[in-house]
Amino acid sequence: MKRTKILTTTIGSFPKPKYLPIIDWFDSARGEDGMNTVKTTIEYSLYNKNKKKSDEELFKRAASEIIKIQLDAGIDIPTDGEIRRENYIHYHCRHLDGFDFDKLEHRVLRDGAYSTSLPAIRSKIKHTGKYYSPNDYIASQSLSRKPIKFTIPGPLTIMDTTADCYYNDRKKLSNDLADTINQEIRHLVEMGCSHIQIDEPLFARQVDDAFLLVLRELKDVFIKSLRILIKLFTFAVDTRIIWMTKIIKKQILNLIFNFLMNSII
């Protein structure tokens, strides 16, 4: 009986080398004062206004080092370590209209376990049209002999790590966010990316919302990009999540079947 190798990957983010012009939330947590997400957000905004073209070589250097670590360890599908991002969520948001990174809003998160000031949603969310994924993917893939996996945050996770001052309707907000994610995915597909990970750890924390919004996310994020392998990443801490993953698989198959039938017709 022929054995099939189980392919390996990493979740996504890696610590940033100190020579980079940015730090992320978790890098700041390693400092003496602990995690300071507000400071990191403000500093990244300032960096965006004053970044240099020469910084690109530093990002490529960091990505190359991080990819090499994974390849040397035998990882089949490496990531670039998300080295261009201040965290795995807000980098996507910075490419959308509707977000305010200048006037942050205070919020209490994680069932009261954490409080901070977050970027605010002050108008309708839509993509600016300046897609980041093609450049980031091509730059990283050029450094790897194996296929690079690209990571994008899911709508629920974005919603839980930003301050909604406009929608007051989680379903509408989720729909608009899902549309921006789908646009980035389409551009990744055009560039030849074959492994895309949608990060949705909030599925496990907000199971009711996951049930309410998951089918819409499947339609807007997954089904429109059938030519690639897309993984939904979450932390299964609720027994309902285990049941829901079975439903997701069934819904994906149904959506694919309906999509193909409609294409034939």
Set out the residue ranges of the language-model regions.
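Domain-level signal for soluble alpha/beta catalytic cores
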Residues: M1-I265
